Curated annotation (Swiss-Prot):
Residue numbers of N5-methylglutamine PTMs: 151
A biological-process GO annotation: translation
NCBIfam families (UniProt xref): L3_bact (TIGR03625)
Record's comment on post-translational modification: Methylated by PrmB.
Organism: Bartonella tribocorum (strain CIP 105476 / IBS 506)
GO CC terms, sorted: cytosolic large ribosomal subunit
Name under which the protein is recorded: Large ribosomal subunit protein uL3
PANTHER family per record: 50S RIBOSOMAL PROTEIN L3, LARGE RIBOSOMAL SUBUNIT PROTEIN UL3C
Subunit organization: Part of the 50S ribosomal subunit. Forms a cluster with proteins L14 and L19.
Amino acid sequence: MRSGVIAQKLGMTRIYNDAGEHVPVTVLRLENCQVVAQRTVEKNGYTAVQLGVGFAKVKNTSQALRGHFAKASVEPKAKIAEFRVSPDNLLDIGTEITVEHFVPGQRVDVTGTSIGKGFAGVMKRHNFGGHRASHGNSITHRAHGSTGQCQDPGKVFKGKKMAGHMGQVRVTTQNIEVVSTDIERGLILVRGAVSGSKGSWILVRDAVKKPLPDNAPKPAGIRRLVKEKTEMVAPVTETSEVEGA
């Protein structure tokens, strides 16, 4: 089981496939996603990695989080989240995950917080059909109607579909297809809509109901830092001896 990533939702657009058909996609940006902490069986009883993403001002970061990020030798992050991983996919602190973590055609599970709609009636919240528009009906056109039985059981059962607060809940959409990735700009394009407003943080992880592609990188798609080692060689100058003065 690999780690997931934290991405930021930029919005929706559409792209065209090889057949000339347009595909609606949601654009997710992966920026500065690093491992800031580890969870091990010996110390915590389970195996996981804590990721941080984005940039946060030091003055807006609490003293506790400043010490947490300083211990990991990373910059303050705007968002942190934890992902369970298998022991063989545990990542070192400071490792940066890129969009190469996912491959086109892969299925992922996406988690976000839906847009809040406020107090909504049953026709909007639960897709009720409503009552008659006329023929004796008065002021109950959009009402929910009866909510229970009679003296027995003498109550309204829990979970009854009624008017109330709608939206602003954690929603996970499973088996979304990764259409493509943009390595240079750090973008992940997934098919269809994703819960959440523009600019919100989205959790993207491998689908639990679909197999992982064989070409998916393990333990993760990390940024390779190539350090060029140059040997400093002192210049050699040839000196000619002048005979005679």
